[in-house]
Amino acid sequence: MEEAIDDHVKLPQKRFYRQRAHSNPIADHSFDYPLLPELSNWNELYPNIGNRQVVFADIGCGYGGFLVTLGETFPDKLAIGMEIRVKVSDYVMDRIKALRQRHKGKYENIACIRTNAMKYLPNYFRKHQLEKLFFLYPDPHFKKAKHKWRIINPTLLSEYAYVLRPGGKIYTVTDVRELHEWMCKHIEEHPCFKRLPDTEAQEDILAPKLLDSSEEGQKVTRMSGEKFMAIFTRL
């Protein structure tokens, strides 16, 4: 039976939500965030799901292309997109709302919040709660003085190890070779993570989707740019 689609509901247009490519993660933005993971009100974000835990987190989810793909690929898993830019996060929230209205019963398992994951990740997730963490096309922060702002660094990796369950995975994708090498070096040096061989990484069901389902990935494809992917297991 064909899926019923409500064509009267229109998807938001990105041109009305444009914002600069990156945001300063150290700036004193104003965010509402739970003091403890137990105080996270997931029912507001997933009103038709019931009492289930978020297990996938897309950090810096951008315009939500990969987040939507996650929802389609794993309909029984809850995924959250975390985005620091206000207009971009507004777009993703409006996009998910429209998708839910257009496709009754679908996309109930994805949501987006505006937050600074570099500061507040442990406020949202319990120890070993997550199965997968995604870092797709993060800000490269090219200047050496700003490398400490990169989303992959030794301090934050310990937080990622805390919220990821043993056997969980970190996924990274970038079109910047130097950043790819930086991320791989720091994750491999952390005692809680081990990189999957490229042959195993290519067999992951998400491998092709990681490269092309996000808006940034599609932009890199249009520009004929290189893409570098790596997957790491939580030991």
Curated annotation (Swiss-Prot):
Belongs to the class I-like SAM-binding methyltransferase superfamily. TrmB family. It catalyses: guanosine(46) in tRNA + S-adenosyl-L-methionine = N(7)-methylguanosine(46) in tRNA + S-adenosyl-L-homocysteine. The lineage of its organism: Eukaryota, Metazoa, Ecdysozoa, Arthropoda, Hexapoda. S-adenosyl-L-methionine binds at G60, E83, I84, N116, A117, L136, S214, E215, E216. The keyword Isomerase does not apply. Its main location: nucleus. GO terms for molecular function: tRNA (guanine(46)-N7)-methyltransferase activity; tRNA binding. It is an enzyme of class 2 (transferase). Its EC number is 2.1.1.33. Pathway: tRNA modification; N(7)-methylguanine-tRNA biosynthesis. Catalyzes the formation of N(7)-methylguanine at position 46 (m7G46) in tRNA. This is tRNA (guanine-N(7)-)-methyltransferase. The active site is at D139. It holds the Pfam family Methyltransf_4. GO terms for biological process: RNA (guanine-N7)-methylation; tRNA methylation. GO terms for cellular component: nucleus; tRNA methyltransferase complex. It comes from the Eukaryota. Keywords: Methyltransferase, Nucleus, RNA-binding, S-adenosyl-L-methionine, Transferase, tRNA processing, tRNA-binding. It comes from Anopheles gambiae. It is found in: Nucleus. InterPro entries: SAM-dependent_MTases_sf, Trm8_euk, tRNA_(Gua-N-7)_MeTrfase_Trmb.
